[in-house]
């Protein structure tokens, strides 16, 4: 098991190097000189060759590309992502509070997505082929097909504006989490619930279930065995939903005026503030890699066959 964990962790580093290099290259995705991009982003009215040369020297654009990448990576490893092109403030000071706001919303939403997916998936699998199963799948399919921004808008209109129960936007207290969490749960639970249901149905059709039933094992004991084996899907759901939700919160945060990474990154994209964009992309990408690795390790702990297959 220790070797398996080491292999999975070792695989993270090449991926992170590739991701970090691709993130670094975001500065060069435009056809113009990065210095010109910076000057335009700062609203400089007259971009002269002297200003371009000065900006190139200030930001180290005269260095070879690999040297620039090395310097940028060493700073990023210390959570120093440079300064904002627009405000001149350190990016870490802007990213830090926004990251914590997004992380809190993501964790709460991920827990709700996991709980909802497991409950609906288990009930649907146990009632497969019956009215309850068909009703759950139909409602889940319908809700999943609805755009998140539409659901959010409807909730704001009826719950916040007409009924005046919850705040429409911003982060003013614990009640501010309710509407965004509901929207995120609706958007993702319908997707993950199908995975839980499929895993439960597969386990219920396994030979060991038939054997335990024939042996007269109590239903509750039998169900515990099935749930334990199907738990791997729930673990994967929880681990993978965190970076997926965090990476997909741009629209939700914009609608609810949530002071998080999504809204900050959207503003940075519109302003061509590349250091902020780089920090956002790198953080989300690293979270994807870390939580995917964590899911593999936890699943291997739950299922020894996965460890054998990875040797």
UniProtKB/Swiss-Prot annotation:
Nickel/cobalt import is reduced in the presence of zinc. SUPFAM superfamilies: MetI-like (SSF161098). It is found in: Cell membrane. Keywords: Cell membrane, Cobalt, Cobalt transport, Ion transport, Membrane, Nickel, Nickel transport, Transmembrane, Transmembrane helix, Transport, Zinc, Zinc transport. Its main location: membrane. Disruption phenotype: Deletion of the cntABCDF genes decreases nickel and cobalt intracellular levels and decreases virulence. GO terms for biological process: cobalt ion transport; nickel cation transport; zinc ion transport. Induction: Repressed by zinc. InterPro entries: BPD_transp_1_N, CntB, MetI-like, MetI-like_sf. Pfam families: BPD_transp_1, BPD_transp_1_N. GO terms for cellular component: plasma membrane. The keyword Transport applies. Residues 99-295 form the ABC transmembrane type-1 domain. It is a multi-pass membrane protein. GO terms for molecular function: transmembrane transporter activity. The chain crosses the membrane at residues 9-29, 105-125, 139-159, 173-193, 237-257, 274-294. Signal peptide: none annotated. Part of the ABC transporter complex CntABCDF (Opp1) involved in the uptake of metal in complex with the metallophore staphylopine (StP). Involved in the import of divalent metals ions such as nickel, cobalt and zinc. Probably responsible for the translocation of the substrate across the membrane. Plays a major role in nickel/cobalt import in zinc-depleted conditions. Contributes to virulence. Required for full urease activity in vitro. Belongs to the binding-protein-dependent transport system permease family. The complex is composed of two ATP-binding proteins (CntD and CntF), two transmembrane proteins (CntB and CntC) and a solute-binding protein (CntA). PANTHER family: DIPEPTIDE TRANSPORT SYSTEM PERMEASE PROTEIN DPPB-RELATED (PTHR43163:SF6). This is Metal-staphylopine import system permease protein CntB. It comes from Staphylococcus aureus (strain NCTC 8325 / PS 47).
